[in-house]
Amino acid sequence: MKNFPKAMIAGLVATIVLSLFFVMKDAMGIMPQLDLPRMIAGMMGMPDAPRLGWAVHFFIGVVLYGAALALLDEHLPGNSKIGHGVLLATAGWLMMMVVLMPIAGTGLFGLNLGISAPIMTLMLHLIFGAVLGAYYGHALARQASVPLRA
């Protein structure tokens, strides 16, 4: 339980990094049809409320991924925190591709948006997972190096 705050902060940092990639993607005009916050809001019946989509996006990144990392980290194979983050993010990507994309109307793996959709979302999830695991590992290492006070 003591690692939940560290995992949540790691989720926040990773979600901010991922969100910056979303903003850069949109600013460069890359795949404008792949607007994940708007898709999330649309799945909630409010396609014209992208702020709702952003809020849910941050909830997923901070709370769900943070909790998953804190709960599963010690049970995942290997010792690499980056590897654990990437593994969790890849599992999340796969769920997104086979459950959420069809619900959003973009088809299995989002292929109605083109072959770039699953490739781009996988790349973004891999980056997210690497940042998630790296920050979490760094936070745990800092905790281990801080001397206990009497």
Name each model feature, range by range.
Residues 1-150:
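Juxtamembrane/disordered regions of integral membrane proteins
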